[in-house]
From Swiss-Prot:
Name of this chain's protein: NADH-quinone oxidoreductase subunit C/D
Organism of this sequence: Pseudomonas fluorescens (strain ATCC BAA-477 / NRRL B-23932 / Pf-5)
Name of the encoding gene: nuoC
Function noted in UniProt: NDH-1 shuttles electrons from NADH, via FMN and iron-sulfur (Fe-S) centers, to quinones in the respiratory chain. The immediate electron acceptor for the enzyme in this species is believed to be ubiquinone. Couples the redox reaction to proton translocation (for every two electrons transferred, four hydrogen ions are translocated across the cytoplasmic membrane), and thus conserves the redox energy in a proton gradient.
Cellular compartments annotated: Cell inner membrane
Primary localisation category: membrane
Amino acid sequence: MTTGSALYIPPYKADDQDVVVELNNRFGPEAFTAQATRTGMPVLWVTRSKLVEVLTFLRNLPKPYVMLYDLHGVDERLRTKRQGLPGADFSVFYHLLSIERNSDVMIKVALSEGDLSLPTVTGIWPNANWYEREVWDMFGIDFAGHPHLSRIMMPPTWEGHPLRKDFPARATEFDPFSLNLAKQQLEEEAARFRPEDWGMKRSGANEDYMFLNLGPNHPSAHGAFRIILQLDGEEIVDCVPDIGYHHRGAEKMAERQSWHSFIPYTDRIDYLGGVMNNLPYVLSVEKLAGIKVPEKVDVIRIMMAEFFRITSHLLFLGTYIQDVGAMTPVFFTFTDRQRAYTVIEAITGFRLHPAWYRIGGVAHDLPRGWEKLVKDFVEWLPKRLDEYTKAALQNSILKGRTIGVAAYNTKEALEWGVTGAGLRSTGCDFDLRKARPYSGYENFEFEVPLAANGDAYDRCMVRVEEMRQSIKIIDQCLRNMPEGPYKADHPLTTPPPKERTLQHIETLITHFLQVSWGPVMPANESFQMIEATKGINSYYLTSDGGTMSYRTRIRTPSFAHLQQIPSVIRGSMVADLIAYLGSIDFVMADVDR
């Protein structure tokens, strides 16, 4: 096993090194091949025969890696810069997170094209279920022992595995789409739910169960989302969430866009998050490039990200209250969002999807008069939140519908990969802005809102308090905005600062290449997670030394949150499910990508 700086590139924490020592002591250094990356965590390759044993060891350490944060694959066949790594046609990575250590570790396993099979780890982490299904769906990698290995993003009738490098990436490479009656009937039959396929019975000892399709076009499903309910009267015996209706192939598209031109696509993952989506992507690209942005860029990025946290939470608040029966507040929250969008549009030029962050900075400097717009909003919103709390959130009907409903504890949340307000509502004090500050969050004073019961009501109240904390952060940005440039003076800043392009022919050529072909990033891997509007969102980028990403893995919080639904809602009423869905705060683009 390689050691020292070859293990991973700083920044890293002491606990990261501790786990490498523990693994070496248990399995011997020869069991691992370390990979040097810019992910900020140990990245270790193991053999397939050792995989389950290593993962089980990490899960059961005294300070365990309790969360399977992510699991996915890479088609390695066209990757040229793989020196020092095990030979592989495909690889699968397991990204583990320990709350107690505040530490991550990534375990990788190499596979040959003729033997694409791994043992399932659903017995170690229950949330591996959907991740393994997606890896099979996208790459065709089998997981032996999986309880139901089937399509999850693509339709049941789909042929091929889209994230393989030999699968077409453009619509023009496919035959024109047509839908005749026979094909329509085939698709409808393929979508039919058969309880036996999922281990469900159609009847019990004294009753017949009813199976109800909620969605994919139901107002309380919050998007194109289908959940099949097994009902005994109004009681939910079991359920099966069915996702993928909003899948657009964002990770595949990243392989055909330059590092710069993919930025607008990030806006459309959590399409309510705006520039919050840009942030983990540009931070990860900047790690690859070795760019350190000016202090002013960090403060601007934080200010605008917190504005979008507020707009997202306001929409959540209005629709959540509407889901449990109050029709009026949603109109007020949307009006309040408009006040925020007035500020956002004045600064970025756009409202919902500004695509405003850039590699090495932001698109342009703050406009004249921005201070007054921000100041007016900061002074105005807290009083509105007080009104919502008093008029709606203290309402006895709303509290009766949500207190004690769809509750789970911290242990269950971590097992299912829950992050964000859903995790903090259980009392777990884990907010990346405090635990692992990025973009200068360590320079701001704010509290991390917590609750204790982990129910639908607590999840709502945590988000309301998060809006108050966002106002505190924005106010500090307003009062302490640094002077200086809005872009880094670095060769890979894209687009480059305009003043540098008009001096001589060399800078003009550099500018032309970067805005046409795109910047060339060094071959390596990088990773960045942030505390986004709906939980932890991250980008894991692989560069092969080109103008486009070799592999872009987008880990979203909502995917994990929807997988948890059956474990939480069994034994509850259908009405409780509606309150639960509203309290999760998800959009299907964030789930399906």
